[in-house]
């Protein structure tokens, strides 16, 4: 197979244009047939208003060695496609089926691999299945009535279900897990373009259907799900897991448990800490959701009027900066054509997130603009101090908005006065809102960094710091505030406990969490033989 890198064509090109470009690049005679697959497509807007798609293409043709040798071009090479493969099973026999705690991306993909390999896992999920969960979330947004275990953070699919649904990751992936996850999503209903888009996106509406289809398949092939089943305790003997205890005091004997908890399972973090599972505080970031008109972002990223003229998707952006005080300020979970959502999961605590549907057709762009937080900011004497710092910010936000999302125009934030109304555009939110003064939620040093960041980003995206940009508070759940320690085999200090995913501090989004779930399943398989 031949790999062509950096094959560039103008946006708006035809399929024939692409085929002709491949033929020209490889000097394939007009009568010679070939097959090709697009492996990656990215948008190059560095020379706007001229926009280009840049491709990575795999080509199958006769005499591949000869073609590559004659061309002698760095962008053309021979490759052997190798997909993700499960490890061979270990020799130790499991006396009981493995248990997975959490049905987010990490838990679902651990369940996927173990189910296909014949381990028939049991999946415990504190929230509801995605259909019922979606109804609870919509009800919360309309009424403010919160279900503590069925909300934007908890339930089948995990926190990423109500987000932008990004499927990109910076995790290095020589094993092929990345593409395997994408292929699995496509198998259960995701659009096939996620396989090659440089910034793949699935959207809340499609992701919910994919999750349901995946669950149905797993059940049909031997997995068991128990929803509304919260882990309350673990039983340990001689430093080995003996059983899991659920909220209703059901005892589930277990030799192996994959803990795919999610970044908001604070009660479970505390329970594990009481059992002295080694964990450490880690860096995270907090800030505000910031909304701009999507057209403003489109024009900045593509050139004036280019989005409609070339039928391009709503433009994303990514901005970052570092300042002399040691803090980083950057965008996080940017949602083109999206909504700001109330993402709370605890009583009297408010936090926000961003969410997009698959079409990204909303009028506003939003992103978290967040400020880095280190253990030095909250005097970490205990591994859970970062978690308590988050809770303090969320409680202050709840009090400020009386349970609603508190909002403020950036110009008013800069002047330290409460807003009275919107400017040239309105907010797009899921959840009740009110105007307030968001100053004082963060420390003065963090506020100063946030202001510097907004001003700096206006040098990259014109009018980014416009006075009527809408801030919503607070974004606190950017990542887990703790890391549950594990060894190179994925196991914690307690034999049989495998912590993973975003909650354990080993992932940062749908893809990396799913890949970590596969890795943990692989770790279990390499050691144990399934119960038959």
What are these regions (language model features)?
Residues 3-53, 58-162, 166-532:
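Residues forming the flavin
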């Amino acid at each position: 197979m031949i790999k062509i890198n950096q094959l560039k064509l103008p946006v708006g090109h035809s399929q024939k244009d692409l085929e002709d470009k491949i033929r020209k690049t490889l000097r394939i005679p007009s009568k010679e047939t070939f097959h090709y697959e697009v492996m990656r497509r990215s948008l190059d807007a560095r020379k706007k208003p001229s926009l280009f798609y840049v491709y990575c293409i795999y080509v199958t043709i006769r005499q591949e060695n000869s073609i590559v040798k004659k061309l002698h071009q760095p962008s053309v090479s021979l490759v052997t496609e190798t997909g993700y493969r499960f490890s061979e099973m270990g020799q130790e026999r499991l006396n009981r089926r493995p248990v997975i705690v959490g049905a987010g991306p990490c838990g679902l993909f651990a369940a996927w691999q173990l189910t296909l390999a014949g381990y028939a896992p049991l999946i415990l999920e504190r929230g509801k299945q995605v259909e019922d969960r979606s109804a609870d979330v919509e009800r919360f947004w309309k009424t403010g009535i919160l279900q503590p275990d069925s909300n934007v953070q908890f339930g089948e699919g995990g926190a990423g279900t109500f987000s932008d649904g990004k499927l990109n990751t910076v995790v290095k992936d020589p094993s092929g897990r990345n593409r395997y996850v994408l292929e699995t999503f496509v198998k259960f209903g995701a659009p096939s373009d996620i396989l090659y888009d440089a910034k793949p996106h699935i959207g809340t509406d499609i992701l919910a259907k994919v999750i349901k289809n995946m669950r149905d398949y797993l059940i049909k092939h031997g997995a068991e799900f128990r929803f509304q089943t919260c882990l309350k305790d673990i039983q340990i003997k001689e430093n080995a897991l003996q059983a899991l205890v659920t909220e209703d005091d059901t005892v589930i004997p277990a030799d192996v448990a994959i803990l795919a908890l999610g970044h908001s399972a604070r009660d479970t973090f505390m329970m594990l800490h009481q059992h002295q599972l080694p964990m450490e505080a880690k860096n995270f970031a907090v800030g505000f959701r910031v909304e701009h008109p999507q057209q403003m972002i489109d024009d900045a990223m593509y050139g004036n009027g280019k989005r409609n003229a070339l039928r391009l998707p709503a433009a994303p952006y990514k901005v970052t900066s570092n300042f002399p005080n040691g803090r980083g300020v950057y965008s996080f979970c940017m949602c083109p054509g999206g909504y700001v959502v109330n993402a709370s999961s605890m009583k009297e605590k408010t936090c926000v997130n961003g969410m997009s549907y698959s079409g990204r057709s909303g009028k506003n762009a939003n992103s978290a603009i967040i400020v880095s937080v280190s253990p030095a900011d909250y005097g970490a004497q205990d591994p859970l101090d970062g978690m308590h710092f988050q809770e303090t910010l969320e409680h202050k936000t709840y009090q400020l908005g009386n349970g609603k999302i508190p909002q403020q125009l950036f110009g008013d934030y800069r002047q330290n006065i409460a807003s009275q109304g919107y400017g040239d555009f309105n907010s797009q939110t899921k959840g009740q809102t009110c105007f307030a003064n968001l100053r004082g939620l963060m420390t003065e040093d963090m506020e100063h960094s946030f202001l510097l960041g907004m001003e700096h980003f206006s040098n990259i995206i014109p009018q980014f710091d416009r006075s009527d940009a809408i801030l919503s508070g607070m974004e606190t759940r950017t990542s887990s505030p703790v890391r549950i320690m594990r060894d190179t085999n994925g196991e914690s200090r307690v034999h049989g406990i495998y912590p993973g995913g975003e909650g354990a501090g080993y992932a940062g989004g749908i893809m990396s969490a799913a890949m970590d779930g596969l890795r943990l399943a692989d770790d279990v398989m390499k050691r144990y033989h399934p119960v038959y």
